Every structure is written in C-alpha cells, then in structure tokens.
Amino acid sequence: LHSIYKPKTSKRKIASLKAFFHYCEFYEFIEKNPFDKIQIRFREPIILPKTIPLQTLELFLSTIYTQRQLATTPYQQKNALRDAAVIELLFATGIRISELCSLKPCDVNLNDNFVLIYGKGSKERKLQIGNANVLKTLNEYKNTFSTEIESCDHFFANQTGKPLSDQSVRRMIQKYAALAGIEQHMTP
C-alpha cells in the first residue's frame, strides 16, 4: 500500500478495512478481527502553511487603498473602508476568517490595541495590534460603522446592518486579488 499510495490514502484504506472487520466481528460474521493485533504507523510529511510573499501582500494592500481613493459615492467609500479594515486586521493578526466574522464589539479594544479571539475548541487568545496604520483604519471603521455595529452586535457588519459572513470576506479577498492581478490563491 505504502509504495502505491500516499500515506493519507493508505491510512484511510486501512481504517476502512479495520472498520469493516470490526463490523463483521460485532455481528458475528467472523470470530476474530484480523486487525486487532496489527499496529501500523505511517510517517506523513509535515506540510507547512503557504505564505504570501511580501511584494504580493504590499500589492494587494495598495490595491485596496487605491480602490478606497477611487470610491466616489458614500456607499462605495463606506464599503472600501470596511474592506480595508477587514483585510488589514486579517493580515496583521493572522486570525481565521470565521474568527474575524464572529468578533463582537467588546472583543476589539482599540484603546489598548488588542483583539480577543475565540478560536477552535473555545480557546481564547489575546492578539496585540502593533501596526499604527491598522489601528487607524480600525478606529475609522468603528466610528463610521457605529450604527451597524450596534444593531448586529458584531464588529464587522455589512451595509444592511447584518454580521459580515465568511463568504463575503472570501469574495472580498478574491475581488481585490483580481483587481491587483494576483493569480496566487490568497488565504489570510
């Protein structure tokens, strides 16, 4: 198996066989499970997360701020500000999109420059925001979107006053990556 398939595939096939023989033993189709005494360990290669090159990130952020400057209507200006705040916080802290979308106003402390994140497994972590530009953008966003933030009780809201969804943020990232001419798949 190991020479034909990748370690994850081999593990999956063996797990399926183990489950099948356990089922057969449970319903007494067989007396003894042949996998009871077999212990197989596979070494899986450690895959490091992909990073976004600094030049690409700078191009991406400059595109967002260019779009913000090009915004003419109040609606476009408001959206551009929100988009800049979302992207800046994502890249400054490295939080997951789902964590960003679930942020409550009380989780974002811009006076002490930190964000409280409730991650997977209800783990709480406090992330410091050290970049002055990010803090400035977040403060501007908070002041501009104060009504929407209060109405939906989430820090990031859309124009209708509802919490920003994961999918909206992913579309936002794709939109600005396309505008910047970045072909690399962007995930914060």
Label every PLM stretch briefly:
Residues 1-188:
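Conserved catalytic core of the tyrosine transesterase superfamily
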